[in-house]
Amino acid sequence: MPAAPRAASASPAAVAPGSDPVVSIDSLDMEARGVGRLVNEDGTPGKVIFVEGALPGETVSYKSFRRKPSYEQAHLLEVRRESVMRVKPGCKHFGVCGGCSMQHLDSRAQLAIKQRVLEDNLWHLSKVRPEVMFRPIAGPDWGYRYRARLTVRYVAKKGGVLVGFHERKSSYVADMTSCEILPPHISAMLVPLRELVTGLSIRDRMPQIELAVGHEVTALVLRILEPLTDADKDLLRAFADQHNVQFWLQPKGPDTVVPFYPLDRELAYTLPEFGIRMPFKPTDFTQVNHHINRVLIGRALRLLDVQPQDRLLDLFCGIGNFTLPLATQGRSVMGIEGSEALTTRALANAGYNGLAEKTEFACRNLFEVTAEDIAALGRFDRWLIDPPREGALAVCKALGELSQQGSDVLPQRIVYVSCSPATLARDAGLLVHEAGYRLAGAGVVNMFPHTSHVESIAVFERR
């Protein structure tokens, strides 16, 4: 029979029958939960305990809500010994709202933990270590989220509408009156939005509001399951005039999104360092954090070390977020994107910014690309890869095959921007172990402060 586990921070007699169990927290997992391990009576390692809200260095009591043979998931009851990294959360809804998971952790410690997550993934998944760890890219901790999807829920018992993020690990909508990670003007609009939707005839047929903040325009996309009445339209127009926003309507899928009022506005963000303005639709993919996006572009271009004669390739190019800045520095750039709508937008943005002659765009499924497809593109001096969470597996496999064939189309340098340390690690393993690259450097990009999301950037150099 296996020995019964006891708390790692206490002797067997220290935990009296019926009292709350105690554990020492050693680390955080990918969901920002504290991780500790119990010790069996015979001194052997026991179960791993995941405690929501606990921090490394703390001793906490907990209550388990899910028990498995090798681990337990638990709620935090009391902090017996507090970490020096613990701070007071900046939002009154923290702990209930699921939008943030790390507000109780000092911002510098957040960066250090994310950097460790990146390093651990690279080593444990692919046995790769960067030659240099870059200083984290960081910016303002509050008011940074310029894109968000808010859930709308009519609650008859409460006599009104809730507008906000989901509660933590729940389908319920948090009763939010403000949000510190949204821009201040959006945070101040949450209560008026609730009042607006409550007054609409379709208040129980509007499940979602998607917001996108541009340089001059704030767009609100209303997901409507029934047509608006004339009275509804009057309310929306009045609200738009009062709060200086633009309403868009989405009756069905994302392709059905159309502007409603006012119609004389253009949603766009700017990249002033490059003299670029990027018009976009509110449902297009754009980075949520404008400040970090600008810093990230600058670092990516410096790491690529673009020369005036270089021919450049931008994979998963979206609306041209990296493509157009690259075009201001290299001889020419080809952008490839899997979405036809985004490819069309990128082409239009190149023309809008006077860069059409230096850019070329194509719509391709990069998740199914082959070595033959890559070879057919010809040689580019430098690549930028910015895939979604799924990563760039097919692309990196193709590079490995081409390397083993002795092909001369492989670029000298690749900068890889990632929103998943696990898929970056997987792809880095292919580039290093099969395609003949070395991982010259990597670092985290704090695109989402106070969340466990880890964005990163890495540079690969051909050996």
UniProtKB/Swiss-Prot annotation:
Coiled coil: none
Top EC group: transferase
EC number: 2.1.1.190
Stretches assigned to the TRAM domain: 14-78
MF-aspect GO terms: 4 iron, 4 sulfur cluster binding; iron ion binding; RNA binding; rRNA (uridine-C5-)-methyltransferase activity
Residue stretches spanning the membrane: none
Keyword tags: 4Fe-4S, Iron, Iron-sulfur, Metal-binding, Methyltransferase, rRNA processing, S-adenosyl-L-methionine, Transferase
Residues noted as binding S-adenosyl-L-methionine in the record, renumbered to the chain: Q287, F316, N321, E337, N365, D386
Catalytic activity reported: uridine(1939) in 23S rRNA + S-adenosyl-L-methionine = 5-methyluridine(1939) in 23S rRNA + S-adenosyl-L-homocysteine + H(+)
Residue numbers annotated as active site: C419
Similarity comment text for this entry: Belongs to the class I-like SAM-binding methyltransferase superfamily. RNA M5U methyltransferase family. RlmD subfamily.
Function description: Catalyzes the formation of 5-methyl-uridine at position 1939 (m5U1939) in 23S rRNA.
Protein name as catalogued: 23S rRNA (uracil(1939)-C(5))-methyltransferase RlmD
Protein source organism: Cupriavidus pinatubonensis (strain JMP 134 / LMG 1197)
Gene for this chain: rlmD
